[in-house]
C-alpha cells in the first residue's frame, strides 16, 4: 500500500466512533506485531518511534524497517518520530520519509512556536507532516517527572496553530504518559472547546495507555476520532 502521511491517516478517519491508535515500536518484533494486528483488525494505525529509540536503532536500520513494513502493509500505516527535540536529527528523519512530532512544549511559548514553525516549513517542502504540542503532560514517557502539568487553553491552541501551521496538534487535557495514580481526570469539556475552535485541524492526545474506554468513547461521540 502506498505510504501515507500522519495528516492523511487522521484526515481519512471519518468514522465518529473510531479512534486512530498510535503505538510505539522498539524493534522488529514490535513492527511485525503492530502490522499484523492492524491488518487483522483492518484498521489504519500510526507507528511511532521515540527519538531516543531511533537514535539507538538508527534511521537506516530501524527507521527503514518501519517504513518498509508500512509500505508493504495491507492497511494504511503512517510512520512518525515521537517526542523529538533534536531539530537536526528530525530533519534527517524527514529526509528519510518519516513524519515527526516536534515537542517544544517544555520551551517558552514563543520559542516553541519558532522551532515548530521551522520544522513545519522543512517538512512541507518534502511532502511530510509535523505534529506540534502545546501544554505539558507532567510525566515523561519513561515515567520521570517533567514539572507541573499545564493544560492547553483554547487561546494557546488557536494561536499556536495559526503561527506554526502544524498538521496535527497534541494537547494536554489531563492525559499523562503511563499509568494514572488514581482516577483519570480528562477534561472532556476542554477538548470540546479546542475542537470547536480549530475546526478540521486534527487534535490528538498522548498517554492513552491507561485512559478508560468510557472516556475514549465519550471523545469519539463528540467527534474526536483522532487520538494517540
What are these regions (language model features)?
Residues 24-25, 207:
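Conserved residues at beta->alpha junctions
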Residues 80-83, 206:
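Conserved acidic functional residues
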Residues 4-16, 26-52, 60-76, 84-202, ...:
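Alpha/beta enzyme core
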Residues 207-210, 228:
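Short acidic/histidine-rich active-site segments
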Residues 56:
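Cofactor-binding active-site loop characterized by glycine-rich and histidine/acidic residues
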Amino acid at each position: 500500500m502506498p505510504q501515507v502521511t500522519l495528516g492523511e491517516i487522521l484526515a481519512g478517519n471519518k468514522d465518529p466512533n473510531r479512534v486512530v491508535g498510535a503505538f510505539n515500536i522498539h524493534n522488529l518484533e514490535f513492527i511485525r506485531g503492530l502490522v499484523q494486528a492492524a491488518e487483522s483488525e483492518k484498521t489504519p494505525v500510526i507507528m511511532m518511534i521515540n527519538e531516543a529509540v531511533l537514535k539507538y536503532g538508527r534511521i537506516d536500520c530501524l527507521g527503514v524497517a518501519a517504513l518498509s513494513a508500512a509500505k508493504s502493509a495491507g492497511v494504511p500505516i503512517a510512520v512518525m518520530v515521537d517526542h523529538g527535540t533534536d531539530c537536526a536529527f528530525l530533519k534527517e528523519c524527514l529526509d528519510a520519509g518519516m513524519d515527526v512530532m516536534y515537542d517544544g512544549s517544555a520551551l517558552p511559548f514563543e520559542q516553541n512556536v519558532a522551532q515548530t514553525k521551522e520544522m513545519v516549513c522543512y517538512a512541507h517542502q518534502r511532502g511530510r507532516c509535523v505534529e506540534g504540542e502545546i501544554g505539558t503532560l507532567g510525566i515523561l514517557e519513561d515515567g520521570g517527572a517533567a514539572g507541573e502539568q499545564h493544560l492547553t487553553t483554547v487561546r494557546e491552541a488557536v494561536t499556536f496553530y495559526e503561527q506554526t501551521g502544524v498538521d496535527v496538534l497534541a494537547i494536554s487535557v489531563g492525559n499523562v504518559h503511563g499509568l494514572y495514580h488514581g482516577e483519570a481526570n480528562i477534561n472532556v469539556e476542554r477538548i470540546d472547546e479546542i475542537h470547536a475552535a480549530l475546526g478540521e485541524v486534527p487534535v490528538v492526545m498522548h498517554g492513552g495507555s491507561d485512559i478508560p474506554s468510557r472516556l475514549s468513547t465519550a471523545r469519539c461521540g463528540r467527534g474526536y476520532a483522532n487520538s494517540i
